[in-house]
Amino acid sequence: MSTLVSIGDLTFHIDPGVALGPMRYGLGPTDAELKALELSREKIMEVSRRAEVSIVTHYHYDHHPFPDDDEMYERCFKDKLVLAKDRTKDINLSGKKRGQIFDSKARGLARAIEWADDKDFELGGVHVSFSPAVWHGEVGSKVGRVIMVYMEKGKDSLLFGSDAQNLADPKALEWVLEKDPRFMILDGFPTIFLGWRMAAASFERSKENLKRAIQETRAETIILDHHILRDIQYKEKMEDIFELAADLKKRLLSAAEFYGLENFFLEAWRKEISRGERRVDVEAYFKGLSDKIDPILDAGAG
């Protein structure tokens, strides 16, 4: 979910982190995934130099650097204003421990660190608003809570939903509807866990929340990504959601699709790649990605 946003005269880097799923089908990451991790990490650090403000929505290692990654900490946070999830409240024990480590490492690098839960900031003519802590998925989730981000300047507005999983928490939906953004980046429900970690009823409730967000906001483009892209069959499982978006003439697509690329399901393909049944060219894919985004970044810098 690492996202670079340029709005007005400022650039924000949201959740500068990357990680792999440790086990899938009883298998660890393939060499292809390890290469993708390496290239993603380098790209995140490369683009982070463009940002004046870094944002951390919660303390999972796919959203901020691992504790031993001093290089990533320095390149992502040095001399920046850091707006982060409060590590002392509305947070589980694991989050408190990770947040304390994050604070100890980033505070000596950052220009300043502000706990951002339920706060508003005016930065260079950009209004930045953070939600109160909402659940990482359904209410009561064992993995804790996150904060969402809304940015607005003039007629432009963007909402980044962090790991809210189809806006499963009703308070997450309420905040999204209140902000009524023109562009949304949302985390989809982890459908790979249906039937064992996640109940079908929870999925159906979350879909109703997502439908309302699509119907009742001005957003004409909604990027739906992250947890849901772990499932190759996510479009079939969310068919009613995609049909609704199409009926409303709204674009609902993954981050890769937003840039005109095919989805690259490396984790879901882990078994096939491990068996030699599927070959992938990770470096070529990342070159294609860079060819898409680098001109946009350079234009923004100009």
Label for each model-derived stretch:
Residues M1-R49, Q100-K171, W175, L266, ...:
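Core dinuclear metal-dependent hydrolase active-site scaffold
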Residues G144, A199-L210:
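Charged helix-capping and loop-helix junction motifs
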Residues G28-L83, E178-I185, I192:
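Active-site metal-binding motif and surrounding structural segment of the metallo-beta-lactamase
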Residues L10-T11, F77-V82, E216-I222, D247-K250:
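A short helix->loop->beta-strand "cap" motif at the edges of active sites that frequently abuts
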Residues T221-G302:
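C-terminal regulatory/interaction regions
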Residues H13-G17, A51-D62, L83-D86, L159-A164, ...:
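Active-site neighborhood of phospho(di)ester-bond hydrolases with catalytic His/Asp-centered motifs
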Residues G28-P29, T57, D156-F160, Q165-L167, ...:
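Acidic/glycine-enriched edge-of-secondary-structure segments
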Residues Y59-P65, K89-N92, Q165-P170, P190-G195, ...:
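Active-site environment of divalent metal-dependent phosphoester hydrolases
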